[in-house]
Amino acid sequence: MENSDVTDALDEAGRSFERSPENVEEGLDVEEAELVQLRRACRLLAAASRLLDDGYYTVVIESSFVAIERTIQFRLVHDGAMSASEVISSHRRLYQRGAEIGLYGDAFGERLAELWNQNRTKTYYRLGIATEAQAESMRELATQIHADLVGASRVKHECLC
């Protein structure tokens, strides 16, 4: 990149991750990996609600899918079905793992995977334009899944929602 402002910004961004943490985001400064996933999901849901009010439907849909996945990941780690360092890069595989440990049935996991496959990609890559109704329904789905999975855990008091 020839624009020095951009390369300077890239350099500064890299340095910002190398410095000692200051002014960290409240609520996410927990030691347990499962709680980091839980609280990230909480923040994604809060952000989705705010962005929905501002009409940012594409981001609400994206945040809702990620909140669902962080919540499932929280339960996988919490229930000992996944190590904190394990990475599941396939969205479908993550939904399947949730079904395998009984967080929900196989059919529900498959429906989540299909919802992601058919709609998240379409919205994200602008093959379709996000609507308010889609954003609202995705946020509601993410909120309901989060409440159900967190409510059935031993650490529901750690939720920031």
Region roles according to the model:
Residues 1-161:
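Terminal alpha-helical segments
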